[in-house]
UniProtKB/Swiss-Prot annotation:
<dbReference type="GO" id="GO:0005524">
    <property type="term" value="F:ATP binding"/>
</dbReference>
<keyword id="KW-0460">Magnesium</keyword>
<dbReference type="InterPro" id="IPR011104">
    <property type="entry name" value="Hpr_kin/Pase_C"/>
</dbReference>
<feature type="binding site">
    <location>
        <position position="202"/>
    </location>
    <ligand>
        <name>Mg(2+)</name>
    </ligand>
</feature>
<keyword id="KW-0418">Kinase</keyword>
<dbReference type="InterPro" id="IPR027417">
    <property type="entry name" value="P-loop_NTPase"/>
</dbReference>
<comment type="similarity">
    <text>Belongs to the HPrK/P family.</text>
</comment>
<feature type="active site">
    <location>
        <position position="138"/>
    </location>
</feature>
<dbReference type="GO" id="GO:0004674">
    <property type="term" value="F:protein serine/threonine kinase activity"/>
</dbReference>
<keyword id="KW-0511">Multifunctional enzyme</keyword>
<dbReference type="GO" id="GO:0000287">
    <property type="term" value="F:magnesium ion binding"/>
</dbReference>
<dbReference type="InterPro" id="IPR011126">
    <property type="entry name" value="Hpr_kin/Pase_Hpr_N"/>
</dbReference>
<dbReference type="InterPro" id="IPR003755">
    <property type="entry name" value="HPr(Ser)_kin/Pase"/>
</dbReference>
<protein>
    <recommendedName>
        <fullName>HPr kinase/phosphorylase</fullName>
        <ecNumber>2.7.11.-</ecNumber>
        <ecNumber>2.7.4.-</ecNumber>
    </recommendedName>
</protein>
<feature type="active site">
    <location>
        <position position="159"/>
    </location>
</feature>
<keyword id="KW-0723">Serine/threonine-protein kinase</keyword>
<comment type="function">
    <text>Catalyzes the ATP- as well as the pyrophosphate-dependent phosphorylation of a specific serine residue in HPr, a phosphocarrier protein of the phosphoenolpyruvate-dependent sugar phosphotransferase system (PTS). HprK/P also catalyzes the pyrophosphate-producing, inorganic phosphate-dependent dephosphorylation (phosphorolysis) of seryl-phosphorylated HPr (P-Ser-HPr).</text>
</comment>
Amino acid sequence: MAVSVQDLLDKIHFHVIYSTETALQKEITTSEIMRPGLEMAGYFDYFTPERIQLFGMKEWSYMMTVVGDNRYDLLKKVMAKETPVVIVARNLEIPSEMVAAAKKADIVLLQSREATSRLNSVLTSFLDERLAERTTVHGVLMDIFGVGVLIQGASGIGKSETGLELVKRGHRLVADDRVDVFQRDAFTLSGEPAEILRNMIEIRGVGIIDVMSLFGAGAVKDSTDIDMAIYLEYYDKEKAFDRLGNAPTIVEFSDVEVPQTRIPVKTGRNVSVIVEAAVMNFRAKQMGFDATKTFEDRLTDLISHNKESQ
């Protein structure tokens, strides 16, 4: 997967110094940013021209000490045809030789008012997300009480209906049916809808519903981190379900572990309310309040008290 320079401009604000239609369509294929410090000093042994070239104060100040044709010759090497875009941070002055080198190689030249380290971080974060490998999973992704929840289960069990009820209760839909999952960083999993299904939910017997049109912009969200998973399964009296909540299940998506709660579904159970309770319980545990542990401590105290009174 690649990101075009135009995609970068659409997302992050820059002052465009030089660009052409063909240069804007150049693809950025890596999230690694190059700060050409050694290259400005003439050392090109490990130069990677396919990366974004970012000029900060150090690179710029050295460049300004090089005069005449030497500066242009040096910039021609740094601004190679393979380079997708060159960015100058801190609103630093851009010399005419840099513009000339950009024109020669047909490279977009940008200027930013941001500090170099912050701009580097913003660029890396954006590119890591956009270039991450996507995995498609079946389910409904919701934002419930600020927690990203992936609802899964067998086909026809009522995932979309549960999602619709949760939207009516004030929560936000991210994706229905197909969820594109990607690893945002080493420990964070995120999900987003397929573009064709954005803001849509399918209810058997009703058809496709445009959630944004019916419930407003506050009922949908473009993407969310996946903090927990909920698996809906048909109730089976022969099967043992976790009744205390002290045996959490862990599922793995794209090498990231996510805690999962399994909820049995049968007639008369209000699944959306149970999902809300599961999410609130998850949040409480994240904040250090564990109802299961409290119950177990009370039970232990009661047993000890009964033994002492005998």
